[in-house]
Amino acid sequence: MNNGILHQNYNSKKFDIIKISLASPEVIRSWSHGEVKKPETINYRTFKPERDGLFCAKIFGPIKDYECLCGKYKRLKHRGVVCERCGVEVEQAKVRRERMGHIDLVCPVVHIWYLKSLPSRIGLFLDMPLKNVEKVLYFESYIVTDPGMTPLEKKQLLTDEEYAEALENYGYEFEASMGAEAIRDLLADTDIESEIELLQAECEESKSTAKKEKAIKRLRLLETFQASGNKPEWMVMTVLPVLPPDLRPLVPIEGGRFATSDLNDLYRRVINRNNRLKKLLDLNAPDIIVRNEKRMLQEAVDALLDNGRRGRAVTGSNKRPLKSLADMIKGKQGRFRQNLLGKRVDYSGRSVITVGPSLRLHECGLPKKMALELFKPFVYSKLRLGGHATTIKQAKRMVELEEAVVWDILETVINEHPVLLNRAPTLHRLGIQAFEPRLIEGKAIQLHPLVCAAFNADFDGDQMAVHVPLTVESQLEARVLMMSTNNILSPASGQPIITPTQDIVLGLYYITREKEGARGEGKLFSSYEDVSRAYNSGTIDIHAKIKLRIDRQVFDTKGNTYNEKGVVNTTVGRALLLNILPEGLSFSLLNKVLVKKEISKIINQAFRVLGGKATVVLADKLMYAGFKYSTLSGVSVGVDDMTIPDNKEAKIEEAEKEIKQITEQYQSSLITENERYNNIINIWSKTSDEVGASMMDAISKDTVSINGEKKEIESFNSVYMMAKSGARGSYNQMRQLAGMRGLMAKPDGTMIETAITANFREGLSVLQYFTSTHGARKGLADTALKTANAGYLTRRLVDVAQDLVVIEEDCGTDDGLMFSAIVEDGEVKVPLVERALGRTLAADVVTEKGVVLLEAGTLLDENLVELLDDNGIDMIKVRSPITCKTRRGLCAKCYGRDLARERQVNVGESVGVIAAQSIGEPGTQLTMRTFHTGGAASLGITVSDIKVKTAGKIKFKNIRTVTNKEGQEIVISRAGEIIVSDTMGRVREQHKIPMGAVVPLASGKAVEIGDVIATWDPHAQPLITDVAGKVVLEDVIDGITSKHTYDDLTGQQTIEITSISQRTTSKNLKPVVKIVDEKGAELKSIPLAVGAVLNVADDSILEVGDIVAKIPLEGSKNKDITGGLPRVAELFEARRPKDAAILSPCDGMVRLGNRDTKEKQRIEIIDKNGHIVEEILLPKSRHLVVFDGEQVSRGDVLADGPTDPHDLLKYKGLEEFADYILIEAQSVYRMQGVVINDKHIETIVRQMLRKAVILDEGDSKFVKDESIELVRILEENDKLRKQGKKEVEYELVLMGITRSSLSTESFLSAASFQETTRVLTEASINSQIDNLRGLKENVLIGRLIPAGTGLAVRKESAKIEKMREELGVEDNMVFTDLSSFNPEEISFDSIQSQKEDKDINEDIEESLRNALESLDF
């Protein structure tokens, strides 16, 4: 057990945290093994390194193992001797990878990261602008370091002339200098403590926010220096470390030249300039020359540390910028992403894949050649153990000669040794799966067809990589966790992912179809065997309708068993499939035409009822059957399969006639350009649909004569069968093949108004072909961009969620989210049953009668969600990752079911990464399009009423109505909804009702299907009065704020309000309609928005419910809706939209029109006592949706616009915000038909809410308005609560995924994500500590990740560590028995309490055994 999992990384030093901080000159010298004095590298004749040069063996160690440079000492026995001739220590050559050197710089040099990485730390520390610091550094001006008694100020800049003048005036009473020395002196002189006190005072007193912010920034920086133990002068270097030579190698290439790492060039420049400066100083050279040399030294060091950060990058001989130290670690090719987060591994190979239709689901075909190479070590050892070879050398020889015995041994070695197959890009965890290899001839890997969907593989030349798990533990994990048979369900949605596609579907569809009058119709068979015999002998046709006697046992999901007996009507093909159907599934699943959806249902049902193993067997059998019968069917595609409908020409002529009329109307100015375009588009899409429909009619029916009479039957047309079964192709593609191609889009998404009337069978004309290239090219360009964008989104998601792991069973919260069905456009898109499946209840579910149906804490499975449905429950509270109280992780209860395993999630599951993959993986399927509404492409018919689709009752929500003079109820509220619930009280429909709609029915009335519950004018939004009175128009001045328009056609005259930008003068006028009573007292004032058309004149009398003005909706409709991938990215990045909706920050009454400025309008919100609580300034062009004097609640919309998620969270709370993100993100995916479980989106949202802003610091050390990790605040509050002090008050802050990733607690994780330089600069100044909690940090340092099996091992290791501490045992001491335990050396008290005779080793082994058991295989 000694070399088991617990002893991984045996020789790596044990460490728990990594700290990064500034290095002092002493520290750099302590790393170093000697000073590099010369720029020489190696002697080009002897190829030996020059002494004191960049590759010096004396400093860095010998070139050959255990051999000094001059050759005096060779062999291991001299180890550790220092040769007196050449000064080289006899050691292993690999010390050249770890020994560092140093360069003593003649003058100090500023580290460019702390100067140029924004915000400039040196500039901020000294409170100087970066420009000034640079002037001093690069010797352009002097800086006063000590003014003495002179009137000069400290840190004042002086030009050469001013300096000379000052010297003349004050002599040597003051000190001023230039260069890094000056900066270093200033940094060292700063008294941090007194500066902090001054700044704190300034923060409290300062009135201006800008000053305050700057002071706070400086204060933070100074405090970090104070706390971290870093000295500010260390940002200026006096000693430069030199990288070990093997990390910047110099390799000879043919032709006597050398290829070298760029770093050597950069170091050479530094050494050259340093040495030259030393000489110049020794010679007492003129100041100007020394100054120039110092500047060049500074520039050389800058280039070495971060080339190109300042000025032009230093280039090599080939005009390419040299790669500096900073470039080595950042970017995709840098150390982090190239070598640490992903490495190339041994025991792997890659090859092209081909299809393996005869494999079983857990197998893959591995070419013999490849297998032999991959399993070589295993084969060698087997050859020796079997006595075929005595030495490894002999075994090697046998393998090279490929003797017969080698192949036999390879077979035994491979037996039950799983291999991993991986297809790039690996977008989700199903991109790597384990298979048992089967040896095959040839050179291509064979892949099982059913796993293609998971790998997204096809056989058009795709390649896959094979990896061999070596250790027993890794083989165990591959078999138990990664075997393809254990990955039947997709972790994103919980639906089967091994469902048959394409040929298989076609074959199954073909044999389950029925044909009228086929041979053997109407016969009765007693069993499957009979049918099979009859079919094989050719007496019955495969499509014949027959009767079959069955007698089966069927299980349902609840575990009940019942018998299925009797004679059923079926067809021969379906009866033949009966053999495949496992015991326990009903024959009714097969007794229908099997299209793709139905086959998916069978697999799903099998998994629910019979479990994984039976499902795998069933899937395999279905696949074999599907392939067999699709081959036998002979379905193929010919030109004649595409039937062109007879009435196509007539329909097109008709359309052209209509278009002619419309063009004439346009030419005689009866309709606008926009209307003309929309009408033409409408006509073409209608025609195109009609032609398509008649084509489908023609292709889907066949006329056959049965016994002399003609009968219409479903067609056996190949193209039709492929599309119908879901094997390949779609209605849309068929329409283009045989109907008409229809309208084509331009790259911006609008439609080209000339439709393509031809189809592919007839062929396109040149013009038609040209029209269609436009959109097609856009499609190809989009696809290329989309892949990159989707990959980047996935990377950001993974990075933000990587450290989220389930770490405990239950956090004990009763918080959660309210879930109900998702309703869009009045239709239930996702029923509650689907959303609730696999979630844990946060509160009891109570029926209408008050009976507790399900208790809180119940995990809802399929049977329980049905129970919810049966009892008509339409809203439940479920626990969610967003509200989980576990710190630095999640609890299993809040997450609920592991979708791929169908039971509660295991502790240790890395749910964050799974969530990120589930959201990112379908990214490539999402469009890049922004949708234009308004164009006919998505116009449809404008909705102007609501008809009910369910019988039941209606209920009003937030609706206020008034009755007008015709006795109609008019809606005067804005965000009203009508809810339709069925007889059981379940919500079936939800409709938003616009202002001004007429509602014929009262709340609570019963409705039947098809009843109209609301009507409105679709073209204009009316402004309605709820009081009666006389009209007074204010600020409605013709020619200034309004204009008369005269309609030629109807002869009507209207008054329309003009926009502010069109007015030349009087910009502060606000057109208003006031309604007054007889005495002239104002009852109501209605502000008029831009574009409003007045319905009333001055002094006219209004009744309740009358329309004052209408706002035409034409203009507002043509906004682009961002859709697809950009929308998902926008949501997760939490971007603030342009012109977002303004929400009310508090409850109160709205007061408008007070103290408006020239460009802005002011909204005031006043409380009950008339005090102003909040003020909001808005541009006058923004249209308000509230009236003067209206009561609003916190979070109500004051001005229309897209939702800003930040405001939503702030004013409406966590739940509303979570709901918004869930529904918005899901609607994008739903449009593409992608199913993603809500919990994945919630998991990411949790990571976006990691920070909180402090409202009241209480008795803590935090600063008000500071934003800090939520975990830190909660931990601080725990401490304060224990001590009985005042706790911190905070509110959650939303951060986009990129910002959230960069502001994690772990600097390693952030640095390996983006902006490496900035992250490392900040971390080192803070002396930041990385606790190595996340997955990424552990991958970086090469440890088991703290998730899955790694978490269990980690917990056990922690236990053992604790035991060892209690026993006072050294790390590396393992006792074989207690007798060797020397009580004199170790304090014996602690062990007395332990079982004295128990062997410690046994304890360790036992805890390891527990660890493996707790993995719950």
UniProtKB/Swiss-Prot annotation:
InterPro entries: DNA-dir_RpoC_beta_prime (IPR045867), DNA-dir_RpoC_beta_prime_bact (IPR012754), RNA_pol_asu (IPR000722), RNA_pol_N (IPR006592), RNA_pol_Rpb1_1 (IPR007080), RNA_pol_Rpb1_3 (IPR007066), RNA_pol_Rpb1_3_sf (IPR042102), RNA_pol_Rpb1_4 (IPR007083). It is an enzyme of class 2 (transferase). GO terms for cellular component: DNA-directed RNA polymerase complex. Its cofactor is Mg(2+); Zn(2+). This is DNA-directed RNA polymerase subunit beta'. GO terms for molecular function: DNA binding; DNA-directed RNA polymerase activity; magnesium ion binding; zinc ion binding. DNA-dependent RNA polymerase catalyzes the transcription of DNA into RNA using the four ribonucleoside triphosphates as substrates. Zn(2+) 2 binds at residues 811, 884, 891, 894. It catalyses: RNA(n) + a ribonucleoside 5'-triphosphate = RNA(n+1) + diphosphate. Mg(2+) binds at residues 458, 460, 462. The RNAP catalytic core consists of 2 alpha, 1 beta, 1 beta' and 1 omega subunit. When a sigma factor is associated with the core the holoenzyme is formed, which can initiate transcription. Zn(2+) 1 binds at residues 68, 70, 83, 86. One of its GO terms (biological process) is DNA-templated transcription. Belongs to the RNA polymerase beta' chain family. Binds 1 Mg(2+) ion per subunit. HAMAP family: RNApol_bact_RpoC (MF_01322). Its EC number is 2.7.7.6. Keywords: DNA-directed RNA polymerase, Magnesium, Metal-binding, Nucleotidyltransferase, Transcription, Transferase, Zinc.
